[in-house]
Amino acid sequence: KTREFSQQFAERAFRRPLTAEQQLFFADSRFADSKPASDSVKEIVLLSLKSPRFLYPDLGQADDYSVATRLAIGLWDSMPDDELLRAAAAGRLNTPDEARQQALRMLRDPRSRAKLRNTFHHWLGIAHAEEIAKDTEQYPNYDKSLEADLRTSLNIFLDNIVWRTAGADFRKLLNSRHLPLNERLAGFYGAQRVKHLGEFGPSFFDHERAGLLTHPYLLALYSYHNSTSPIHRGVFVTRHVLGRSLKPPPAAVVFKDDTFSPDMTMREKVTQ
């Protein structure tokens, strides 16, 4: 059983069956002397995890197993499952249609949703977002529970566009009028309440809001603790949406909306 485990571990690490040479080097030869079996297993595990064939998924021949590896890493951030390995062993991944069928199966797995959500979080700059601090005097009803609800609302918004909206594409992320609200958020924004606390239902906000760029969580994240920040939001849009780089500012400037005339537009304030 120890030898069988060692072989299976190396095959899982390499995401394909071992060749005869690999079988000898990574498994059989490690049990050739009289050292304890546990030491042999440790040695095999370390050798496998240090091998370029584990560290570099594209290393090796392009075949069904490499297709299985690309699917698993691309959709799950993981290794191929048993179904993928069986399909690769049977040579059922060598055409686009066969690979597409496996991809559709994998998209129904919760791991695909988790992978895509993480991708969105990195794109939006919220993967490692710290707590959003707000002025308690200016926003007395803002607390950590409300912040958690805002983040949940954003996640549900993304899920609804990607997984539940037929024919949706990237544009829908930017122009959808749908904003998931629970009772607490509805009360905070003065919108129509949903029936049960904690249940996020659909709501259509005012006509000035649409899509990700006006979602309350992102607006709260890319702003100061007591005021708006068109600079932070502009940098976010430029870098994360338009994909353009920005030079460092010539000097540190703090934008304070109340220092400008109320008759000025936001564009005029930022330009000045």
Regions found by a protein language model. Name each.
Residues 2-3, 19, 37-41, 48, ...:
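Active-site-proximal structural scaffolding
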Residues 161-184, 188-192:
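Gly/Pro-rich turn-and-neighbor structural signature
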